[in-house]
């Protein structure tokens, strides 16, 4: 059930936004010039919110406002406006641990209007678009690996006291509406004939019906849905894919954490890996040059290996040097370094398995379920698109059903190459 709409709430437009902002912006984030002269455009291309660019004489800012329904689903899919507050709070938490080198600055939040203003990122572009274009980013793996390590470690029981962790869990437990969307769209609907499913038909019909009859895969999906619902390990971004990352050659910013909540670490990691694999399998639809395509596919696979390597290295370093955190208490290992390393190895082995399952779940969702990805959906030749998707579905099943057999990320990318 959605919350009641505040009496002062109203959706803003390009015409009404300047007047609203004129009395609320501080000098440090003021666009400059007269409000009536600001250039305002609505650029939201996501599923949830209105996104405005406000350009003045001195500065450009972003304003993001939640609507009382899912933008991609219309007024027939109501949603609480409180999701704007959750996104704002996740951005603040992420900036606390990952810093503004990876997280955009937020200028102010208005709960009654379900709106916040934030830094305009330029010349950054959405990563997904650049992956379609076949562009490489030398800092990407280092930045995303560090983002994952800092945010997941520092909001977990390993990195914070039990009291702090439980308070954080309580704060984000109320973001249940967006969690329900994830529970439905990723963990449930791709595995039966749900109304919102949207696959390449009829070319992929046989593969989709095979997935619906795959009891072994469905059992794993249900088990990981339960883990998603019950394992409050750390504060997640909740929707970490290439559409939630903006990049330049030298800078990376993670955006759009409105799905943030306390959940299993492997969900964020798996989402990102799954999207890199989708980009990998989509390449025949975007580049007919075999040598160039193979080179870029290798770069995509190495992003998976390198991101995991950076993540585990940074996470382990934070763990080694921690000064608080009630899980794996420091006192237990002061005289036994080998025991700590063994505990860490076991932790990462479990996390790898869970991350791979989640990667496969994300891949299935994007091919069979609601809200697919541009790198596949925009391949105009349906036979070619279906071929890419069929290979991706084969990989997804392998990750879901056989995750434990993959002992490292190198074995994962070798499996992808033979699909």
Swiss-Prot record:
Pathway in which the depicted protein is active: Amino-acid biosynthesis; L-methionine biosynthesis via salvage pathway; S-methyl-5-thio-alpha-D-ribose 1-phosphate from S-methyl-5'-thioadenosine (hydrolase route): step 2/2
Binding sites annotated in the UniProt record for substrate: 239, 365
Gene deletion effect: Inactivation of the gene precludes growth of the strain with 5-deoxyribose.
Record EC number: 2.7.1.100
Membrane-crossing segments per the record: none
SUPFAM superfamilies for this protein: Protein kinase-like (PK-like)
Binding site residues for ATP: 49, 64, 256-258
Chemical reaction(s) catalysed: 5-(methylsulfanyl)-D-ribose + ATP = 5-(methylsulfanyl)-alpha-D-ribose 1-phosphate + ADP + H(+); 5-deoxy-D-ribose + ATP = 5-deoxy-alpha-D-ribose 1-phosphate + ADP + H(+)
A molecular function (GO) term: S-methyl-5-thioribose kinase activity
Entry keyword set: Amino-acid biosynthesis, ATP-binding, Kinase, Methionine biosynthesis, Nucleotide-binding, Transferase
Similarity-based family: Belongs to the methylthioribose kinase family.
Subunit field text: Homodimer.
Protein name as it appears in the record: Methylthioribose kinase
Species of provenance: Escherichia coli O45:K1 (strain S88 / ExPEC)
